[in-house]
């Protein structure tokens, strides 16, 4: 077996409502004065105050619709390559129909869990592993009544996510990706576990 890394473009819908509500912080921190100066120079750029640490630019996080290089990835797998793809979620692109339908990059961030879920679907995987810093998904995380969850149906997971039981920028995206994968085809399972116990998780 050989390993290959594929720089991956992810097609998004240019009309995704996320583009009107940028939420993903990127780049360095700035002072309020600097941030307002940047926004005055280019009104398309949005900066917000970030947890008392300064101001950062925020961009959209649209839903991934298609992996542009999916055929290349599958061809590599068929030829016994270990493929590294969708790094960081992938590069967000949209169709530019004013330029023969070519792809063009957009200022956005693809959620890496949803990007990985789409890749798992394209590879016709039966199981998706999402590895993180904790061993279990939990409700009431970090509280005295924290409860670690072992097995959930997609409906149960969705109910808990809708109740706000999971961290918005940490566990909730993983749970949402797990739900999407489990519902994409009968018999599919997603396992969320600790990176340092990946071998045990996959056993």
Name these PLM-found stretches.
Residues 1-203:
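C-terminal catalytic "cap/lid" subdomain
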């Amino acid at each position: 077996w050989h390993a290959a890394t594929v720089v991956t473009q992810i097609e998004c819908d240019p009309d995704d409502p996320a583009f009107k509500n940028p939420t993903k912080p990127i780049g360095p921190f700035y002072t309020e004065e600097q941030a307002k100066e940047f926004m005055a120079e280019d009104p398309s750029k949005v900066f917000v105050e970030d947890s008392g640490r300064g101001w950062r630019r925020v961009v959209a996080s649209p839903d991934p619709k298609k992996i542009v290089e999916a055929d290349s990835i599958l061809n590599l797998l068929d030829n016994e390559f270990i493929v590294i793809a969708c790094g960081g979620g992938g590069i967000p692109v949209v169709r530019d129909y004013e330029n023969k339908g070519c792809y063009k990059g957009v200022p956005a961030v693809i959620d890496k869990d949803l990007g990985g879920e789409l890749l798992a679907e394209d590879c016709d995987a039966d199981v998706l592993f999402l590895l993180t810093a904790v061993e279990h998904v939990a409700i009431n995380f970090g509280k005295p009544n924290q409860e670690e969850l072992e097995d959930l149906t997609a409906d149960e997971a969705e109910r808990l996510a809708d109740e706000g039981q999971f961290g918005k920028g940490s566990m909730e995206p993983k749970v949402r990706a797990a739900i999407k994968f489990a519902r994409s085809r009968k018999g599919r399972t997603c396992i969320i576990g600790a990176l340092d116990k990946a071998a045990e998780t996959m056993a």
